[in-house]
Amino acid sequence: MTASHPADSGVCIRPAEPRDIASVVEFRSRMFRELGWTDEARLEEVAPLASAYLREQFASGGCTGFVADTPTADGAETVATVVVVWQSVPPSPRNLAGKQAYILGMYVMPEFRRRGIAKALMEAAVECATEAGVPLITLHASDQGRLLYEQMGFHSAPEMRLFTEHAARSAWRPVDDAD
Protein backbone atom coordinates (compact mmCIF):
# COMPACT_ATOMS: atom_id res chain seq x y z
CA MET A 1 0.00 0.00 0.00
CA THR A 2 1.23 3.46 -0.81
CA ALA A 3 0.40 6.44 1.34
CA SER A 4 -3.14 7.77 1.04
CA HIS A 5 -4.93 10.84 2.32
CA PRO A 6 -8.45 10.73 3.80
CA ALA A 7 -10.48 13.49 2.17
CA ASP A 8 -9.92 16.87 3.83
CA SER A 9 -8.32 15.32 6.92
CA GLY A 10 -4.82 16.76 6.50
CA VAL A 11 -3.29 13.38 7.34
CA CYS A 12 -1.35 10.77 5.43
CA ILE A 13 -2.05 7.04 5.92
CA ARG A 14 1.07 4.91 5.48
CA PRO A 15 2.29 1.41 6.34
CA ALA A 16 3.65 1.14 9.87
CA GLU A 17 7.35 0.61 10.43
CA PRO A 18 9.24 -0.65 13.49
CA ARG A 19 9.85 2.99 14.49
CA ASP A 20 6.05 3.32 14.97
CA ILE A 21 5.87 0.70 17.73
CA ALA A 22 6.23 3.31 20.48
CA SER A 23 3.19 5.18 19.13
CA VAL A 24 1.16 1.96 18.90
CA VAL A 25 2.01 1.06 22.50
CA GLU A 26 1.28 4.57 23.80
CA PHE A 27 -2.02 4.81 21.92
CA ARG A 28 -3.04 1.35 23.13
CA SER A 29 -2.44 2.49 26.72
CA ARG A 30 -4.56 5.59 26.07
CA MET A 31 -7.29 3.37 24.65
CA PHE A 32 -7.31 1.17 27.76
CA ARG A 33 -7.58 4.27 29.97
CA GLU A 34 -10.48 5.63 27.90
CA LEU A 35 -12.22 2.26 28.19
CA GLY A 36 -11.97 2.33 31.98
CA TRP A 37 -8.73 0.60 32.89
CA THR A 38 -7.77 2.02 36.30
CA ASP A 39 -4.58 0.17 37.26
CA GLU A 40 -1.79 2.48 36.05
CA ALA A 41 0.91 0.16 37.41
CA ARG A 42 -0.48 -2.63 35.24
CA LEU A 43 -0.43 -0.38 32.16
CA GLU A 44 3.19 0.51 32.89
CA GLU A 45 3.96 -3.19 33.27
CA VAL A 46 2.32 -4.16 29.97
CA ALA A 47 3.90 -1.41 27.84
CA PRO A 48 7.41 -2.93 27.53
CA LEU A 49 5.88 -6.39 27.04
CA ALA A 50 3.65 -5.09 24.24
CA SER A 51 6.61 -3.28 22.70
CA ALA A 52 8.74 -6.45 22.71
CA TYR A 53 5.85 -8.47 21.27
CA LEU A 54 5.31 -5.99 18.45
CA ARG A 55 9.04 -5.74 17.67
CA GLU A 56 9.18 -9.53 17.37
CA GLN A 57 5.98 -9.73 15.30
CA PHE A 58 6.99 -6.94 12.91
CA ALA A 59 10.44 -8.52 12.45
CA SER A 60 9.02 -11.99 11.77
CA GLY A 61 6.15 -10.87 9.54
CA GLY A 62 3.64 -11.87 12.23
CA CYS A 63 1.93 -8.51 11.99
CA THR A 64 1.68 -5.39 9.92
CA GLY A 65 0.02 -2.08 10.52
CA PHE A 66 -0.84 1.39 9.37
CA VAL A 67 -0.43 4.84 10.87
CA ALA A 68 -1.92 8.25 10.20
CA ASP A 69 0.51 11.17 10.25
CA THR A 70 -0.27 14.86 10.25
CA PRO A 71 2.24 17.44 9.04
CA THR A 72 4.10 19.51 11.64
CA ALA A 73 6.80 22.16 11.46
CA ASP A 74 9.35 19.43 12.27
CA GLY A 75 8.02 16.83 9.83
CA ALA A 76 5.07 14.72 10.94
CA GLU A 77 3.25 13.56 14.05
CA THR A 78 1.49 10.20 14.30
CA VAL A 79 -2.14 10.73 15.29
CA ALA A 80 -3.65 7.26 14.77
CA THR A 81 -2.59 3.62 14.50
CA VAL A 82 -3.91 0.16 13.68
CA VAL A 83 -2.13 -3.21 13.76
CA VAL A 84 -3.07 -6.40 11.92
CA VAL A 85 -1.82 -9.55 13.67
CA TRP A 86 -1.72 -12.69 11.53
CA GLN A 87 -3.05 -15.72 13.42
CA SER A 88 -3.10 -19.43 12.73
CA VAL A 89 -6.27 -21.24 13.82
CA PRO A 90 -7.59 -24.75 13.27
CA PRO A 91 -9.29 -25.05 9.87
CA SER A 92 -13.08 -25.01 10.04
CA PRO A 93 -15.93 -25.23 7.53
CA ARG A 94 -15.90 -21.42 7.26
CA ASN A 95 -12.11 -21.06 7.30
CA LEU A 96 -10.41 -23.90 5.44
CA ALA A 97 -7.16 -21.92 5.31
CA GLY A 98 -6.87 -21.80 9.09
CA LYS A 99 -5.76 -18.17 8.92
CA GLN A 100 -7.27 -15.08 10.43
CA ALA A 101 -6.31 -11.50 11.12
CA TYR A 102 -6.79 -9.82 14.48
CA ILE A 103 -7.06 -6.02 14.53
CA LEU A 104 -5.54 -4.32 17.55
CA GLY A 105 -4.34 -0.88 18.52
CA MET A 106 -7.00 0.96 16.49
CA TYR A 107 -6.76 4.38 18.07
CA VAL A 108 -7.19 7.97 16.90
CA MET A 109 -6.13 10.88 19.10
CA PRO A 110 -9.30 12.63 20.36
CA GLU A 111 -8.62 15.92 18.58
CA PHE A 112 -8.39 14.06 15.23
CA ARG A 113 -11.57 11.99 15.55
CA ARG A 114 -14.61 12.34 13.27
CA ARG A 115 -12.41 13.11 10.23
CA GLY A 116 -12.50 9.72 8.49
CA ILE A 117 -9.09 8.66 9.80
CA ALA A 118 -10.30 5.51 11.59
CA LYS A 119 -12.23 4.48 8.49
CA ALA A 120 -9.19 5.02 6.27
CA LEU A 121 -6.98 2.98 8.62
CA MET A 122 -9.54 0.18 8.85
CA GLU A 123 -9.97 0.13 5.08
CA ALA A 124 -6.20 -0.24 4.71
CA ALA A 125 -6.16 -3.06 7.29
CA VAL A 126 -9.07 -4.92 5.65
CA GLU A 127 -7.54 -4.50 2.19
CA CYS A 128 -4.22 -5.83 3.47
CA ALA A 129 -5.87 -8.90 5.03
CA THR A 130 -7.97 -9.53 1.94
CA GLU A 131 -4.93 -9.32 -0.33
CA ALA A 132 -3.14 -11.78 1.99
CA GLY A 133 -5.95 -14.29 1.44
CA VAL A 134 -7.14 -14.19 5.03
CA PRO A 135 -10.82 -15.24 5.17
CA LEU A 136 -11.61 -13.92 8.66
CA ILE A 137 -10.82 -10.65 10.44
CA THR A 138 -11.62 -10.24 14.14
CA LEU A 139 -11.43 -7.33 16.54
CA HIS A 140 -12.78 -6.13 19.85
CA ALA A 141 -15.04 -3.12 19.41
CA SER A 142 -15.40 -0.25 21.81
CA ASP A 143 -18.76 1.48 21.96
CA GLN A 144 -17.16 4.40 20.08
CA GLY A 145 -15.91 2.19 17.23
CA ARG A 146 -18.80 -0.26 16.93
CA LEU A 147 -20.83 1.74 14.37
CA LEU A 148 -17.85 2.13 12.03
CA TYR A 149 -17.07 -1.58 12.22
CA GLU A 150 -20.70 -2.51 11.58
CA GLN A 151 -20.82 -0.15 8.59
CA MET A 152 -17.75 -1.95 7.24
CA GLY A 153 -19.50 -5.33 7.52
CA PHE A 154 -18.24 -6.58 10.88
CA HIS A 155 -20.81 -8.26 13.12
CA SER A 156 -20.93 -9.60 16.67
CA ALA A 157 -20.02 -13.26 17.17
CA PRO A 158 -20.90 -15.61 20.03
CA GLU A 159 -17.43 -15.60 21.55
CA MET A 160 -17.04 -16.07 25.28
CA ARG A 161 -13.94 -15.60 27.40
CA LEU A 162 -12.62 -16.25 30.86
CA PHE A 163 -9.74 -14.32 32.39
CA THR A 164 -7.96 -16.71 34.72
CA GLU A 165 -5.52 -14.20 36.19
CA HIS A 166 -7.01 -12.17 39.05
CA ALA A 167 -5.05 -9.01 38.18
CA ALA A 168 -6.53 -9.00 34.69
CA ARG A 169 -10.05 -8.99 36.14
CA SER A 170 -9.62 -6.72 39.13
CA ALA A 171 -8.47 -3.44 37.57
CA TRP A 172 -11.23 -3.16 34.99
CA ARG A 173 -14.24 -1.05 35.81
CA PRO A 174 -16.49 1.25 33.81
CA VAL A 175 -15.21 4.78 33.18
CA ASP A 176 -18.25 6.16 35.03
CA ASP A 177 -17.01 4.51 38.24
CA ALA A 178 -13.42 5.74 37.88
CA ASP A 179 -13.54 8.80 40.14
Which positions does each model-derived feature cover?
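Conserved beta-strand in the GNAT
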Residues: 67, 76-86, 102, 107
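Conserved acetyl-CoA binding element of GNAT-fold acetyltransferases
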Residues: 94-110, 161
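Conserved acetyl-CoA pyrophosphate-binding loop and the N-cap/start of the following alpha-helix
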Residues: 112, 116-124
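Conserved GNAT acetyl-CoA-binding A-motif
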Residues: 122, 129-142
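Conserved catalytic-core motifs of GNAT/GCN5-like acyltransferases
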Residues: 86-92, 138-144, 150, 155-172
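A short helix-loop-beta-strand connector motif used in the catalytic cores of GNAT acetyltransferases and
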Residues: 52-67, 102
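Conserved GNAT-fold acetyl-CoA-binding loop/helix
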Residues: 29-53
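A short beta-loop-alpha structural element at the N-terminal edge
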Residues: 12-26
